[in-house]
Amino acid sequence: MQIPALADAEELTCDVLVVGGGTAGTMAALTAAERGANVLLLEKAHVRHSGALAMGMDGVNNAVIPGRAEPDDYVAEITRANDGIVDQSTVRQTATRGFAMVQRLESYGVKFEKDEHGEYAVRQVHRSGSYVLPMPEGKDVKKVLYRRLRRREMRERIRIENRVMPVRILTADGRAVGAAGFHTRTGAFVTVRAGAVVLATGACGRLGLPASGYLYGTYENPTNAGDGYAMAYHAGAELTGIECFQINPLIKDYNGPACAYVANPFGGYQVNRHGERFVDSDYWSGQMMAEFAAEVASDRGPVYLKLSHLPEESVTALESILHSTERPTRGTFHAGRGHDYRTHDIEMHISEIGLCGGHSASGVRVDDHGRTTVPRLYAAGDLACVPHNYMIGAFVFGDLAGADAARFTAYEGELPPDQLRAAHDLVYRPLRHPSGPPQPQVEYKLRRFVNDYVAPPKSGARLSLAVEHFERMRTEIAQMGARTPHELMRCAEVTFIRDCAEMAARSSLARTESRWGLYHERTDHPERDDEAWLHHLDLRKSPSGAMEFTARPVEPYLVPVDGYAPTGGTPRHLGEIHPEQVATAGPRDRAPIGSNTATRTPTAKAASHSPRILEALALAEGEPELGAFTGYLTDPDPAVRSAAVAALTESAPTGVGPALAARLADADAGVRAAATRGLLELVEVLDPEPELRTGLLRASMGSDPEVRAGALEVLRALRLGDAPHYAGLLTDPDIEVRLAAVRGLVSVDAQDELVRATTDPAREVRVATARALLSPTHLTPLLDDGDALVRAAAYTSLAGAGCPDDLAVRAVAALADPAWQVRAGAATALSSAPEPLAVPALTTTLTDPNADVRKAAVLSLRAQATPEARTALAKAVNDADADVRAYASRG
């Protein structure tokens, strides 16, 4: 498709723009229309079957029905489940308005289970509170809502645009004024001016990668890719609790819930493989998930939903609910495995991570009417941070947002041109390079990083690596290619997922404590810290474009809860959260510093457009004789000669070795480098002929250090060099050449010549020499070297060379060296030392603070193989380090 001009955008106007036609979005549209507003409802799929609700629903999790539950009890329950970090005013809206919403939905045609007396059949699932209200025909809820939207009085006020996907909320004068997006079937650019905007795009369900590896095999509806999180963030709204992930128990290998809360009233329950109940937590929370995860990982796992003990009528009733309402494909899944609830309990596992305000607490910050921190921008449903809000809460806040937004009329000013251009570029960028990396590959890589570095248990190091990966992937995402409007939609979703991934990683870094059980388990900050962190963690996009954070104290509760006493107070501005320095051997101010190496300036290659380049490269497609390359290898253009060298390397005709060696003397550094790489690449198949040896010897004495080092490596590999030649290059000014000379001397067993390198000015050369020397006499001077790594290498080599009494005494003394590398080397040396000296010293070393030193001691004790050594090893089987434990256990 062609990129449409920005000037050709289709412009729509409304009083209230609702983005997302799922649970909250449909209710927001209905309420706003009932209040007299002209509503535009945008849905990137089709409203009739979009959103999480369309995947099936078996009941209401949080129905506060008068006579069966009290609003204040529910508020307290949710406060405890969320470890005290809640805005009770929002939770109380769901508690007090939920029953009226049930009745409203019932008036639309949604069916809720009732008993013989016509009373709502509320079930008790947890050890306190009765909030679960089954919906025997929950699969039809979206159909009922769509029917309501299509009523004549609603059609007069609500315009539905299916297959239109907003990508950015437009703002002017600090408030929301519309949106920009595109049509996912035609590709047309669409702009909307609105008096208010309600975001109801659901969770970010496509954040982590499912265990199956399927991009769309997620627990949540996979079309919910975090669109609203990203749009709210870029519009300047605050998000909060993003570090509190959504993680759910599910059926193993199936992207749907096990529905233990449905089975519990029938007598089903979760058990480990021994049939034992194991969940101590009293409410569906991160703490429950922590218990669940621990049980799965223990020798008591796997974990099951036990149903096989139930009577036939209970099983039949459960089948009628579970196979037709929540995930209707469930029955097919079990049948495909030959499983039946009567004979097989259901193996459970843990879902991938996601962001969801309605099932955990990660969402857009809203007040008790769904208002965000950006005027006239609202959020509702799973996108909004109203902890454990579930379906009824989504309906309630959709209603609240729609009612409040209906106060505003359409924006009449100019839509911001800079924001329109940015949105246009975001949408159509993949069309500019249609052959770029496809969305599935880029998305898979992105979400694999989420699993590897962001999913709990979390640590500062892994989260820091996550930030690094997500920052780098901005470029890869910008290079994605697309050819159709549908592919454009998927590419845009990947940008949303990346934004959410970065928010998740940085938020998790910012909260330096553990809270919410498994949802935010920090291995480097394992304790909950209410004094410092009984705070909401808010994030926003600063005016400079950086992601910045604020710790906002929890306001005093409306409903007191034992164990928590928030007092509010002044927010603590944290600013940007920077990743820790990781992926290095240690802090750079303490790491060993190598010798200065001459800087090699990369060769700048002038652009060449000679057709002979293509001709030379084309030679590799056939099986040419060496003579076919001659003219190209001597072409005046170095780019042609480089291309000829590459083709020659690829085709490798007879005589390739001497031909490449001849190019080592080329006048152009790029050609010489290509020839060096070619020889190293082909070294295993080269014929060690005299002509090649002559060319290599000549090149090893040339002016190019890269060529000299490469020529020495090929000489060594082909056994064409000799000790005098290698020894003569031990004084070469380039470190890499001297290292190659050391390796050459080792290859011809020239120990006497090798000793000359023990005084080399470069640490790297001395270390290589120490590792190669085979005589304690030759190694002794290096034990006094001023560099710790050289001493460590020398002691390590004593293990193979033999460690006589006098050197064993020195090794024992070296166990107290400040450098752990030296201590580890000394411990290794003692493996070949006399037992009376070695074993007592090694036994003491088992308490060294460095794990690698302890590991070296264990390995040396195993080599000693005396009763005293075995006694010492028995003490190390409970060491904190896995390697130490493993080797000690092998005795």
What are these regions (language model features)?
Residues 2-13, 35-37, 46-48, 104, ...:
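Glycine- and aromatic-enriched mobile tails/lids
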Residues 49, 101, 106-193, 203-210, ...:
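Conserved redox-cofactor binding core of oxidoreductases
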Residues 16-40:
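N-terminal Rossmann-like FAD-binding beta1-loop-alpha1 element of flavoenzymes
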Residues 17-19, 192-202:
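Short hydrophobic core segments
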Residues 231, 237-347, 404, 408:
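An anion/pyrophosphate-binding glycine-rich loop and adjacent beta-alpha core
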Residues 607-609, 638-639, 669-670, 705-706, ...:
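Alpha-helix N-cap/helix-start positions at coil->helix boundaries
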Residues 199-257, 391-404:
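Glycine-rich loop(s) and the adjacent beta-strand/alpha-helix scaffold that form part
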Residues 598-602, 622-632, 653-665, 685-699, ...:
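Amphipathic alpha-helical scaffolding segments comprising HEAT/armadillo-like alpha-solenoid repeats
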